[in-house]
Amino acid sequence: MSATSTSRVSREERREAILNAARRHFVSTGYHGTGMDDVANTLGLSKPIVYQYFSSKHDLYLAVLEKAGKNLQDTISTALNQSGSNRTIVRASVRAFFDFVDDDMQYYQLLFDSDMLDDIEAAEHVEQVMSTVVTYIAHHISHATTLDPARAQLLASSVVGASTSAAKTWVKTARHELDLSLIHISEPTRLLSI
């Protein structure tokens, strides 16, 4: 068979397919309602094949969570790496967070609204993701303003905390009623024009 044959899938492509199928199941039926056989059946695979990639459902869940976190971190990092004023860039990072929520609702749900948030490893992973996002923003703030690193970290934590809280409310109550472009969630960034 040739390398381009549709019947042969690379190990990485299969791993991605398993992660995507698992993400859909974990979001729709929760961690406890999802079995490895559900993921395997979705892809037309045997359960032992899924276990070749992930040793347990918990390992699979953490891998999906890791992918969600990387997606969020990349989204924020991209927003922070554009040109413009400090205020514009931090506003763009807030907007990027809301775009992540809107575009990647399943990843958002896994990170912030999952039945596994009480799992120690999952909670630590989400905390690490958010800590990294805060660090990205704080680094940008401290290099673009006269704020010392500790104050930049505090301000970045405030921006991320406010964005996370507002996003939860937006998702639960007003997501389809409010035009996101009209939400001035990033007004606290006015403080950054110091």
Give residue ranges: language-model regions.
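Amphipathic alpha-helical segments used for helix-helix packing
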Residues: 100-121, 138, 165-172
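Helix-turn-helix
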Residues: 17, 21, 25-59, 63
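Amphipathic alpha-helical packing segments from all-alpha helical-bundle domains
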Residues: 70-73, 120-145, 153-158
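N-terminal intrinsically disordered/low-complexity leader segments
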Residues: 1-13, 150
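Hydrophobic alpha-helical connector segments
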Residues: 63, 77-103, 155-159
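Alpha-helical DNA-contacting segments of helix-turn-helix folds
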Residues: 59-68, 75, 129
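Single conserved hydrophobic/aromatic residue that forms the stacking wall/gate
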Residues: 183-194
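Short, hydrophobic secondary-structure boundary micro-motifs
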Residues: 109-112, 149, 179
